[in-house]
Design a protein with these regions (language model features):
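Juxtamembrane intracellular "pre-TM" segments in multi-pass secondary transporters
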Residues: 1-15, 193-229, 413
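Helix-loop boundary and gating motifs at the non-cytosolic
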Residues: 7-61, 225-232, 236-257, 262
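Residue-level signature of mid-helix packing/kink "hotspots" within the transmembrane helices
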Residues: 33, 61-69, 153-154, 271-279, ...
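Helix-to-loop junctions at the C-terminal end of transmembrane segments
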Residues: 67-79, 277-289
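Structural signature of the two symmetry-related core transmembrane helices
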Residues: 82-96, 292-306
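Cytoplasmic helix-loop-helix junction between adjacent transmembrane helices
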Residues: 112-151
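A membrane-interface helix-boundary motif in multi-pass transporters
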Residues: 164-177, 372-390
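Helix-loop junctions on the cytosolic side of multi-pass membrane transporters
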Residues: 186-201, 399-411
Length: 413
């Protein structure tokens, strides 16, 4: 028991607000009913054609990203909690209203508006986590955020599916209520963390987090390391996007009629491992720099996805999934840490709003690239390309790690 408790040591002694955000995030993610079922709702419940639904879903995602960008600026300008309360509550009200409206056009418009205003509050949790932590505590705190996401998404879709089929009104009300509960937890128990002028002055002693004046673009230009990092992470997400695209095609190609069942089971393996292993991996890597962890994650992507070039058995697919899942945990928990450690104290909200766009970009390019490549070769050859990209990304990340190490040593001397 003592050995097991040692794995939880990194999570002890964190600020109370971090634990509140952890529970608030679980509640919010468990109640994320509408998003995952939006396509199904618009197609089968409202009766919109698939072509139009595709356009609506794309616009909905775009509005959410625009809202996130604007929200990042407001978070830095007026404060974290104000943005969360005003725009988070507005989004929740929108979802709640859909429970009592029958007009499909009005429902569609409300859902799109809710996605837009809800996007404003998306960077809040990450920004507060950055404000309240530094060093090893920051690794543990972002690891908790990642666990909350996985716990929520392990339970949420099951509950959402049940409500969608049997109690549609509560499908919308449940999303709204869990949104309100999560916001209430943060509003009551978490203080405003927007840096004061004194804290901004103190930040000048931290070369990588010192205050900056001007726009997000100006701050990025002054930090070329973050620009390079953003490019590398796009490569990582191009690779990672194949867990839904390339993997589903290969499993269907090999297992035919059982393909959907086997693909679903591999997704379950991924979800369970993400929920269970995060604590142990965070503890094992607590003394390793975020950049190096991400580089190791890239190697595991190369191995886990690359081995699909030659495997055929279900059990080998489980091993493959387990391998790239460990890589996913390393990349996901340390990417936020790296961004936080290199973000000026004055621009934390804006920098936290950029990451979802980087992720979306990778997930947009990945399937398109893979589809084109497979069209002219075959599905197995895709994994050679994916493994090569993962290796390139990993090597670039390791180079970034060495550059950062030299910079830190120069500052300390």
């Amino acid at each position: 028991m003592k050995k097991i408790s040692n794995y939880f040591k990194p999570y002890k002694g964190l600020p109370l607000s971090i634990y509140i955000i952890f529970f608030a995030s679980i509640v919010n993610n468990v109640g994320n009913f509408v998003g995952p079922f939006l396509t199904m709702f618009l197609t089968y419940r409202i009766g919109i054609s698939i072509g139009v639904v595709g356009i609506i879903v794309a616009i909905n995602a775009g509005l959410g990203l625009i809202g996130t960008m604007i929200g990042g600026y407001l978070i830095d300008s007026i404060g974290r909690k104000k943005v969360l309360v005003v725009f988070g509550v507005a989004a929740g009200i929108g979802y709640g209203l859909c429970a009592f409206i029958n007009d499909p056009i009005i429902i569609t418009i409300i859902l799109m508006v809710s996605s837009f205003v809800g996007g404003f509050s998306h960077p809040v949790y990450g920004t507060i986590t950055t404000d309240l932590t530094e060093g090893k505590q920051r690794n543990a705190a972002f690891s908790l955020n990642y666990m909350a996401l996985n716990i929520g998404f392990s339970v949420g879709p099951l509950l959402a599916g049940f409500l969608y089929e049997n109690y549609l009104m509560w499908f919308f009300l449940g999303d709204a209520i869990t949104t309100f509960i999560s916001i209430a937890l943060v509003f009551v128990f978490v203080p405003e963390t927007k840096p004061t002028k004194v804290e901004m002055e103190k930040s000048k002693t931290k070369a990588l987090e010192s205050a900056e004046e001007g726009s997000l673009l100006k701050a990025l230009i002054k930090r070329p390391t973050l620009l390079i990092f953003s490019f590398i992470i796009v490569i990582y997400f191009i690779v990672f996007s194949q867990f839904t695209f390339g993997l589903s095609i290969q499993v269907g190609d090999i297992f035919k009629n059982n393909g959907a069942t086997i693909f679903g089971s591999l997704m379950t393996v991924n979800a369970v491992l993400c929920s269970v292993l995060t604590v142990f991996i965070t503890s094992a890597t607590k003394n390793i720099k975020a950049a190096l962890c991400i580089a190791i994650g890239g190697l595991l992507y190369a191995l886990g996805f690359g081995m699909m070039f030659f495997i055929d058995s279900y059990y080998m697919f489980i091993i493959s999934t387990a391998t790239w899942t460990v890589g996913e945990i390393l990349v996901a928990t340390n990417t936020s840490v790296y961004i936080a450690n290199h973000t000026p104290i004055t621009h934390r909200g804006r920098f936290n709003s950029v990451f979802p766009i980087i992720r979306k970009l990778g997930f947009m390019i990945g399937p398109m690239m893979a589809g084109f490549y497979v069209k002219y070769t075959n599905i197995r050859n895709l994994w050679v390309l994916v493994a090569a990209l993962a290796l390139i990304g990993s090597l670039m990340m390791y180079k970034l790690y060495t550059v950062d190490k030299i910079k830190v040593e120069a500052i300390q001397t």
